[in-house]
Amino acid sequence: MPQLLVQAPPWVRGVFDHAWAPMQALTRQVSSLPDALCDYLMACEVGFLAICPGESRYQLGPGRIRDREVQNVAYVSVEDLAHDNERPLHVIGHLIDHHLGCGGDPKGPWLTDGGGATPGWQEAGGRLPGLFALGYGPDEIALSDVRNYFAQSLALYCRERQRLNVADPQIHKWFRSVLWNKGFWRAQERQRRKGSR
């Protein structure tokens, strides 16, 4: 966003020494996600990532960034990037949950709601409410609801895997065997191609 650092608090400008620095910080965080997931999200017709002043949040449905119509935006706070905390990946986790569940359809079920872009995703996502119900979420945010459980756990898997594994070994195993599993991604791509014929 133009003038992002000008709009940011002075302490943020002290962390970032040039206008592209927040984007570089976001790129570092996103680079911890699996390549197959990033490829999948890039292929979706909707879904957008933007750095903003204010709070990090996921906005479902239509929006506008500059003069561009967009849909399903993960707004990442420049302050969260300056703090180098897990909030950017948490918000991106909501975008991932939504798009793996229904490809970003505003009225479709998210992965954590029982949706799934393929039968394999639906089966994998169907396990998430049961894992959440066990009550082993790594922190209060993760324990608040199943969507936050997924998003916060994903952020911690990217940043503090050992902490997540100690707090909730089952969701750690889910991420390792599903989202970070190249074989699982290949199988989903085969299912998707088979379904489009």
Question: What is the role of each PLM region?
Answer:
Residues 2-17, 22, 38-197:
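Active-site-flanking segments in enzyme catalytic domains
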Residues 30, 34-37:
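Generic structural signal for alpha-helix starts
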